[in-house]
From Swiss-Prot:
Binds to the SNARE core complex containing SNAP25, VAMP2 and STX1A. It comes from Homo sapiens. Belongs to the complexin/synaphin family. Nervous system. In hippocampus and cerebellum, expressed mainly by inhibitory neurons. Overexpressed in substantia nigra from patients with Parkinson disease. One of its GO terms (molecular function) is SNARE binding. This is Complexin-1. Residues 1-60, 74-113 are annotated as: Disordered. Positively regulates a late step in exocytosis of various cytoplasmic vesicles, such as synaptic vesicles and other secretory vesicles. Organizes the SNAREs into a cross-linked zigzag topology that, when interposed between the vesicle and plasma membranes, is incompatible with fusion, thereby preventing SNAREs from releasing neurotransmitters until an action potential arrives at the synapse. Also involved in glucose-induced secretion of insulin by pancreatic beta-cells. Essential for motor behavior. It is found in: Cytoplasm, Cytosol; Perikaryon; Presynapse.
């Protein structure tokens, strides 16, 4: 019976003790290997960051060349200029600058109100029309 169990489980019986929390084989160089692995990871991360920074600097140089060629300003520069213009307009004012109202915007509303009132008066009987027109 013992033979059959050994054959069925194979070499798993040796690992069974480890899985259940038994004695593990300790590698004397495990700490050294872990330290080397951590150092390799740190170096790889530094190389990746350096490569990314170099690539981003090259891209920015190309972008700046295109901006210079076509006279395009950076978004930050445009925003700074717009902010400076807004501050220059409102230096003496305590409130924000008012938006310009296009001509004729408010005038049309009053005319429409009068025409609606006239239309309503037309449908009223004569004596009421006289009272409302006064």
């Amino acid at each position: 019976m013992e033979f059959v169990m050994k054959q069925a489980l194979g070499g798993a019986t040796k690992d069974m003790g480890k899985m259940l929390g038994g004695d593990e084989e300790k590698d004397p160089d495990a700490a050294k290997k872990e330290e080397e692995r951590q150092e390799a990871l740190r170096q790889a991360e530094e190389e990746r960051k350096a490569k990314y920074a170099k690539m981003e600097a090259e891209r920015e140089a190309v972008r700046q060349g295109i901006r210079d060629k076509y006279g395009i300003k950076k978004k930050e520069e445009r925003e700074a200029e717009a902010q400076a213009a807004m501050e220059a307009n409102s230096e003496g004012s305590l409130t924000r600058p008012k938006k310009a109202i296009p001509p004729g915007c408010g005038d049309e509303v009053e005319e429409e109100d009068e025409s609606i009132l006239d239309t309503v008066i037309k449908y009223l009987p004569g004596p009421l029309q006289d009272m409302l027109k006064k």
